[in-house]
Amino acid sequence: MMKVLVVVALLVTLISYSSSEGIDDLEADELLSLMANEQTRKECIPKHHECTSNKHGCCRGNFFKYKCQCTTVVTQDGEQTERCFCGTPPHREAAELVVGFGKKIFG
């Protein structure tokens, strides 16, 4: 009976050790994923910078993600080109203003 208890205790110890190793591996994978997301965040395009070549790469603002806003520019030669920049659309800018004002009033 004593040998059976020792073997069971040994098996429980081995199983718990192997499962903790699996959890550590999982945490390492999550950490690598978070680091990749942080790298992507650093590569985003800030407000008022050009986003013509990457229209979905604008950074996040205080409350919303900036939108790539495009305009058509006519050069002196009469050639039309599209130029885009990251910015806050007017309706979202108004929402941020209202929320900021509400925070000042209500703390």
UniProtKB/Swiss-Prot annotation:
UniProt note: domains: The presence of a 'disulfide through disulfide knot' structurally defines this protein as a knottin.
Which tissues is it found in, per the record? Expressed by the venom gland.
Alphabetical list of InterPro entries matching this protein? Spider_toxin_CSTX_knottin (IPR019553), Spider_toxin_CSTX_Knottin_CS (IPR011142)
Q: Which residues form the signal peptide?
A: 1-20
Q: Can you list the disulfide-bonded cysteine pairs?
A: 44-59, 51-68, 58-86, 70-84
What keywords are annotated for this sequence in UniProt? Disulfide bond, Knottin, Secreted, Signal, Toxin
Q: What is this protein called?
A: U1-lycotoxin-Ls1o
Recorded family membership:
Belongs to the neurotoxin 19 (CSTX) family. 04 (U1-Lctx) subfamily.
One GO CC term on file: extracellular region
Task: Fetch the Pfam families from UniProt.
Answer: Toxin_35
A GO molecular function assigned to this protein is: toxin activity
Q: Where in the cell is it found?
A: Secreted
Q: Which residues form the propeptide?
A: 21-41
Task: List the source organism.
Answer: Lycosa singoriensis (Wolf spider)
